[in-house]
Amino acid sequence: MPVDINRLTDGWLELESDPGLFTLLLEDFGVKGVQVEEIYDLQKTIEGPVFGFIFLFRWIEERRARRKIVETTTEMYVKDEEAVNSIFFAHQVVPNSCATHALLSVLLNCSDIDLGTTLSRLKVHTKGMCPDNKGWAIGNTPELACAHNSHAMPQARRRMDRNSGVSTGRFTGEAFHFVSFCPINGHLFELDGLKPFPMDHGPWGEKEDWTDKFRRVMSDRLGISTDRRIAITHKLKMLRTNQTIVSAALEKLLKSKQLESRSQAEIRETVDKIKKEEQESTVKLSSEYSQLLEMHEKDEPAVAMSKELESLVSLNSSSDSVEIIGETEIKKENPPPSPPPAFIGAGTFSPKDLLSLLKNLESEINITEQHLCDENEKRAMFKVDDCRRTHNYDEFICTFLSMLAYQGELGDLVTQHLVTSRKPSLGGVQNSGSRGVVRNYNKKSTTNGSSPKTPSSKRRRGRTKYRKRK
């Protein structure tokens, strides 16, 4: 059928979210053996093979702007150009075409579907293209545009005509938006034409189907979780408790190190004292033995010598006993220090390790406190937005306009606004919609070279005569 190619990119109409409509649209595309079913429960078992899921949600541009920062930090985009071009991922460059984009994202990434002539040609033609070119290829395919618009409601056509003067683009979105989820090369991919890259949610388990992976992803995204402030507060409490424990352990370890150094110094002093006493006793014994040798040289009687030896032996034994007793007394007076108490367990930590652990805890506490502050601010913004949304501004607007009218400024403001919107541009060109009207102000010359009198001068003269008559 003949189609105006120049009007394809600005003539796509918005479609309703209806499984029957999508199934008929697939038939118009030429696809065989595939239908679309609506799912109300993710946990419900789906019969037959599933080629993909299409997720529908209400599109709000402000919500998308708020999600930009979060998405860039949490979502795993596939940014490799070769990997992106190897799959069918197209940017939505044509407004109101997200329904067709969602269907094509599922169909053209499956190898065991009878695509028909149109989609098979499109798949071959766009192989290896970048996402932007694939988006333009979809928008400039007459069969797709005609099939898409044939299922639109008449209200959609009237809305399109009403908004014909409004600039539409990739980011001035529809009321609803469609996102596709499909398995590609063993990974679950999320394909959204309004995002810069496809999103890889990773592989699924060996003993599960890819639909189970999809259910987990959607449950995490749509599930209602507990208040984050409670979890963050609990985490902050645990971190502060651990900080107190580590600080006490570090202080205890430093004290034990000091006691150990003191005990070692006392032991050294005791050992030195004992050695000194042993040296003194050795000097005393050597002097006594020298006296015995002198007596032996003088050939003293054996009896006297034996007595001296007995006395020496008794003296020696007494000195030994004195040394033993003295050493015992010293040990009693200075008992060895008790071993330092064991710290934490068998594997002890050094003060350096504990100090590093303490710094990490302090850093984690600061981060958690910031998260708690952010959650509190977000909750406060929820309340502010709710107040703005539920507040009735009609009374304020009526009062404001009434005060302007009472002061005589409302009419002037309205007139000024209308004059500004209708003010002609330089060169005599006045905008009238999208058309330009050029007014000719050339003066007509007379035979004597004088210019004709303007109407304004006549009016002024007439007023002057009228004043003179009075």
Curated annotation (Swiss-Prot):
Superkingdom of this protein's organism: Eukaryota
Region of interest called Positively charged C-terminal tail required for binding nucleosomes, as start-end residue ranges on this chain: 422-470
Site (Important for enzyme activity): D192
Catalytic residues identified in the record: C98, H177
Keywords tagged on the record: Chromatin regulator, Coiled coil, Hydrolase, Nucleus, Protease, Thiol protease, Ubl conjugation pathway
GO cellular component, one term: chromatin
Subunit structure: Catalytic component of the polycomb repressive deubiquitinase (PR-DUB) complex, at least composed of caly/calypso, Asx and sba (MBD5/6 homolog). The PR-DUB complex associates with nucleosomes to mediate deubiquitination of histone H2AK118ub1 substrates; the association requires the positively charged C-terminal tail of caly, probably due to direct binding of DNA. Interacts (via ULD domain) with Asx (via DEUBAD domain); the interaction produces a stable heterodimer with a composite binding site for ubiquitin.
Composition skew (Polar residues), residue ranges: 423-434
Domain (ULD): residue spans on this chain: 392-420
Protein name: Ubiquitin carboxyl-terminal hydrolase calypso
Biological process annotations from GO: epigenetic regulation of gene expression; heterochromatin formation; protein deubiquitination; ubiquitin-dependent protein catabolic process
Subcellular location: Nucleus
Organism, as annotated: Culex quinquefasciatus
GO MF annotations, alphabetized: chromatin binding; cysteine-type deubiquitinase activity
Positions of the record's site feature: Transition state stabilizer: Q92
Function: Catalytic component of the polycomb repressive deubiquitinase (PR-DUB) complex, a complex that specifically mediates deubiquitination of histone H2A monoubiquitinated at 'Lys-119' (H2AK118ub1). Mediates bisymmetric organization of the PR-DUB complex and is involved in association with nucleosomes to mediate deubiquitination. Does not deubiquitinate monoubiquitinated histone H2B. Required to maintain the transcriptionally repressive state of homeotic genes throughout development. The PR-DUB complex has weak or no activity toward 'Lys-48'- and 'Lys-63'-linked polyubiquitin chains.
Occurrences of domain UCH catalytic (ranges): 11-241
Coiled-coil intervals, chain numbering: 260-280
Family, similarity comment: Belongs to the peptidase C12 family. BAP1 subfamily.
Gene name of the record: caly
InterPro entries, sorted: Papain-like_cys_pep_sf (IPR038765), Peptidase_C12_UCH (IPR001578), Peptidase_C12_UCH_sf (IPR036959), UCH_C (IPR041507)
